[in-house]
């Protein structure tokens, strides 16, 4: 019995390395890689279309987890917003939804200043289809800028910090895609399967048939 107990205890660190969100395993920690230090999961949630259709699981990774949205946005440290697709969606639809959400969260001056980079980011998504289970991420590399990765391949980079700050507002800003989603990825007590607030469905992503 003592041996069995010791064996079970020895497995605990490994069992704690992933979190299950809608039966999808989300890593609690990302190991250091080229240009990114080790990152810890701050929070994760499922984004739904009209509160019913799951689109993706979003997971926010930080060097130092925090539930303070302003701190997440302003701190000049490595970050990753990772997405695991729950259904097939055209990348351009995701790009369009991002563009709409940015318009909601930025004032006219900010939007005008960032529009060239926003257009470049939209172009990086291309017209491919992201399939169920596909993983993509938007990374912030300190001193460099925003990096888009899709299917394990880097699609491009955009310099500076302002664009990534704006992108984070889509999920944790004053008008996020969902209040529940925001609370969950900030490590709050909201349910992991956070659904859209009805007033925010204008930023929803339509799935492919």
Regions found by a protein language model. Name each.
Residues 150-152:
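Short strand-turn-strand beta-turns centered on an Asx-Gly dipeptide
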Residues 13-15:
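N-terminal signal peptide c-region/cleavage motif recognized by signal peptidases
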Residues 65-143:
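Mid-length scaffold segments of soluble, non-membrane domains
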Residues 1-4:
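Positively charged n-region of N-terminal signal peptides that target proteins for export
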Residues 180-209:
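Cysteine/selenocysteine-centered motifs that mediate thiol-based redox chemistry or coordinate metal-sulfur cofactors
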Residues 19-75:
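N-terminal structural module
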Residues 32, 147-148:
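Short aromatic-centered micro-motifs
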Residues 155-181:
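Flexible glycine-rich active-site/ligand-binding loops centered on an Asp-His dyad
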């Amino acid at each position: 019995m003592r041996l069995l107990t010791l064996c079970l205890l020895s497995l605990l660190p490994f069992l704690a390395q992933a979190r299950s969100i809608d039966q999808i395993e989300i890593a609690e920690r990302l190991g250091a890689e080229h240009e990114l230090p080790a990152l810890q999961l701050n929070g994760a949630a499922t984004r739904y279309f009209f509160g019913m259709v799951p689109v993706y699981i979003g997971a926010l990774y930080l060097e130092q987890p925090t539930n303070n949205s302003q701190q997440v946005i302003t701190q000049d440290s490595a970050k990753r917003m990772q997405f695991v697709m729950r259904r097939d969606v055209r990348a351009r639809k995701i790009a369009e939804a991002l563009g709409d959400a940015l318009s909601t969260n930025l004032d006219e001056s900010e939007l005008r200043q960032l529009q060239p980079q926003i257009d470049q980011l939209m172009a990086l998504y291309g017209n491919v289809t992201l399939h169920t289970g596909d993983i993509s991420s938007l990374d912030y590399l300190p001193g460099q800028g925003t990096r888009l990765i899709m299917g394990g391949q880097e699609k491009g980079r955009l310099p500076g910090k302002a664009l990534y700050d704006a992108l984070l507002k889509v999920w944790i800003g004053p008008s996020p895609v969902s209040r529940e989603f925001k609370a969950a990825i900030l490590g709050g007590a909201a349910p992991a399967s956070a659904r859209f607030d009805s007033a925010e469905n204008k930023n929803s992503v339509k799935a492919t048939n």
